[in-house]
Amino acid sequence: QMCAFKSGGLFKASFQMAAIIAGVKKDLLEALSEFGQSLGLIYQIQDDVLNITENDLSKMKGLGEDITEGKISLPVIYAMENLPKEKSKKLAQILSLHSQDKKLIRQAIDLINEGQGIEKAKIVMEKLFTEAWEKLNPLLDDNEDKENLYSLAKFLITRQV
């Protein structure tokens, strides 16, 4: 829900406004709105993944900043579901501390990885993209704009910054 309200709503509104200005038909407006919502969710999930993986973004923002904030992201949720009870409790405990201790942050990241939180979050991103694109694709003309939209969406899933 947090993702839907945060980035999902912004992307959805952007797509809706562009579609309304372009004067598209209702079915295309709805598909574009849903696609925008999905892209926003994908963007936020990827941002959460990047925060707990070593990459250019985490070098700028700080690795595990979301852990320090105690953020319950999608990778954390999946990890907690998949970890044994004691390890899930340990992850929850670390998050509740809002600690900047690098060892605790590393331990939390290791637990998220052990619980396959990142892998499952990536599966969700691909599913969101595929479902939204399958609804939108047949409504769009085959042209460079369609290819650019597809490329932008795929970039959001694979971006490293």
Where are these regions (language model features)?
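All-alpha prenyltransferase/terpene-synthase fold signal
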Residues: 1-161
